[in-house]
């Protein structure tokens, strides 16, 4: 698969590169593979922008797990402890919160940074059992960034996904026995193997990777060119 990646304004250019293994096969409609993590605020913003494509395209969503902070223990880590010695550019947090607000998100900075493996396993459960991935993604992001809940906790994950239409009892059983732990690990390995080091990364029709929570107009432009066949197959 050949991929085209773009970053945020001011970022270093991301080169067009080849050598990535194929993402899941794309159908005739617009097929998005969203590589993201639930503790990434820009992933939540990106999801909100991508959702708007559904007004213009027949979109199929596939989730691919990514662990932004793989060293976080199962019980999570306090933000104050994790943030010691870390700084942000002036205005970064205010800009993030305002950008999220513009996307309809009441973004907060939860006091706990959770381990997200259970949340990713819940997403995989939903994917394998006919769940609405848009709703599940939004429910888990909302639980963390807006309700400030610990999405490393089974009860929180089950409640959030249950509100998105997932069978809570079946989900709890799957989380308790680690049914999707190996698949989630495979997805994380796939992402790293294919050079994905930042999220969100959105792969359009298995061929073009757009990095970052880009403006909706850019997402729509890429989707439109692919739908029209303006981009030659490789």
Where in this protein do the model-derived segments appear?
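C-terminal cap of thioredoxin/glutaredoxin-like
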Residues: 2-59, 63, 124, 128-131, ...
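Structural alpha/beta surface segment adjacent to cysteine/selenocysteine redox centers
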Residues: 44-145
């Amino acid at each position: 698969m050949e991929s085209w990646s773009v970053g945020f304004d001011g970022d270093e250019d991301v080169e067009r590169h080849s050598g990535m293994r194929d993402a899941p096969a794309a159908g005739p409609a617009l097929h998005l593979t969203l590589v993201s993590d639930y503790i990434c605020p820009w992933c939540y913003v990106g999801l909100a922008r991508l959702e708007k494509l559904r007004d213009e395209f027949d979109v199929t969503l596939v989730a691919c797990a990514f662990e932004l902070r793989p060293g976080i223990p199962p019980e999570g880590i306090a933000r104050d402890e994790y943030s010691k010695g870390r700084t942000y550019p002036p205005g970064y947090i205010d800009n993030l919160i305002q950008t999220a607000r513009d996307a309809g998100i009441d973004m907060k900075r939860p006091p706990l940074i959770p381990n997200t493996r259970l949340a990713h396993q819940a997403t995989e459960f939903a994917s394998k059992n006919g769940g609405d991935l848009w709703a599940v993604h939004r429910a888990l992001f909302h639980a963390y960034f807006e309700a400030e809940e610990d999405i490393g906790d089974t009860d929180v994950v089950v409640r959030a996904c249950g509100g998105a239409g997932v069978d809570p009892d079946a989900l709890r059983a799957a989380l308790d026995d680690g049914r999707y732990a190996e698949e989630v690990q495979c997805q994380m390995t796939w992402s790293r193997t294919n050079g994905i080091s930042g999220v969100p990364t959105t792969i359009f029709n298995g061929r073009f990777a757009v990095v970052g929570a880009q403006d909706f107009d850019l997402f729509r432009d890429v989707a439109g060119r692919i739908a029209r066949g303006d981009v030659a197959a490789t």
